[in-house]
Amino acid sequence: FFISILTANAQSVVGKWKTFDDETKEAKSIVEITERGGKIYGKVIEILNPAKKDIKCKNCSGADKDKPVLGLEILKGLSKDGKEYSDGKILDPSNGKLYKCTVSLDGNDKLKVRGYVGISAFGRTQVWTRVK
C-alpha cells in the first residue's frame, strides 16, 4: 500500500520545485505545485535571494498587479494531457507577462517548464529541480 503511494508521488509534478535564473543560473525561488479540480497550479513559497524577498509584481496586470511575488500563483490551471500538462498559463513576475505553458517531468526530479506566445516553437524552456 505505502509503496504504491510513494511510486505515484515520485512520478507526480505535485510538490516543491526550485527555479533558476535564465541568465545567471542561480537558484531563484521555490514553487509549490498543487492540484485543484484536476488542474495544477504553482505558487511561489520562497524567494532565495534575501534582497528580493519583498519584491512586488509591479508589471503584472489585473488581480496580480503590485502583489508580493512571495505567495504569487505563477502556474495557472494546467490540465493533464498524456505525459505533460498544458492549456494553462505561466506568469513571469519579472515582466508581468502571462504565457501559454506546458509542463512535463524529465525523470522524477526535473521538471521542464515551457512558456511561449502563439505556438510552442516560439518560447523558452526552464528546468526546475525537485526539492526533497
Predicted ranges, named:
Residues 60-66, 112-119:
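Short aromatic-glycine motifs in intrinsically disordered, low-complexity regions
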Residues 12-26, 124-132:
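K/E-rich alpha-helical interaction surfaces of small helical-bundle regulatory domains
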Residues 3-10:
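Sec/Tat signal peptide C-region and signal peptidase I cleavage site
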Residues 21-92, 98-99:
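Central antiparallel beta-sheet cores of small beta-barrel/beta-sandwich binding domains
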Residues 11-16, 81-88, 109-112:
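Short, hydrophobic/aromatic-rich segments at coil-to-beta transitions
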Residues 22-24, 93, 104, 118-119:
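Short polar/acidic secondary-structure junctions
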Residues 35, 80, 105-106, 130:
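Generic beta-strand structural signal
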Residues 108-110, 117-132:
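Edge beta-strand at a domain terminus
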